[in-house]
Amino acid sequence: MNTPYLSIITVTYNAELVLGRTLESVAMQTYRGFVEHIIVDGASKDHTLELVRTYKQEHPEIAVTLVSEPDKGLYDAMNKGLKLAKGEFVSFLNAGDRLHDKMTLEDIFDNAEHPERIGVIYGDTNIVDNHGNYLRQRHLSAPEQLTWTSFQKGMLVCHQSFYARRTLCPPYDLQYRFSSDVDWCIRVMKAGEECGLTNLNMHSVLTDYLDGGMTLKNHRASLIERFRIMAHYYGLLPTIWNHFLFLFR
């Protein structure tokens, strides 16, 4: 079996207090395939860049790329990372997030049969606090079989637990400031379906996600964007109905 080559993209800005555990979670992986770690920094003014440079020096087995410059927001930075990525699969692991345990990547790729037939690999997500302590499992659970229509019921898979084949990945649509990841995941899955690729459910927690991200801080604006995205892909009336059902979930 060919070993998939993975690109992990991490976006940072003044993240010295939480970035360390993100970098450590990548460095401790038992996975023996080639991994590149692309870190896109928004011109941090704290010690974020020092942390990354030390990480790069101490872990030559990981191909670390650092870009630090002003950006136009999170999704602009993520697009910069996508342009640099060379891996067969791409994942996003932003500052404060971490791979769930040291076996995460090995479990994903060494146990995936025929990875060349896979469009997306996905799993569940734990929520952690600023100190990395477990708070709860994410409210929405990954469906048994994920398709592009699954997000009619909400974003059932956290972006950080969504590993996408790079050739399927479009740029993030910058018209969406808070929920472009929803639109992006749908487009990735639609493209995979058109290519006859399948999506693989790992049936395990892949990521510990830092509570209180940009979407939560801009909750109302994010909900409006998500409604627009869902109406675009699934139709206005089904989207209204599904949002009515959300009230009782």
Predicted region positions:
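Nucleotide-sugar donor-binding/catalytic module of glycosyltransferases
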Residues: 1-218
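Membrane-interface aromatic/basic loop that binds lipid-linked glycans or pyrophosphate carriers
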Residues: 1-3, 32, 44, 229-249
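A sequence-level detector of short, solvent-exposed, charge-rich linear segments
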Residues: 100, 105, 187, 221, ...
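Catalytic core of nucleotide-sugar-dependent glycosyltransferases
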Residues: 192, 204-205, 216-240
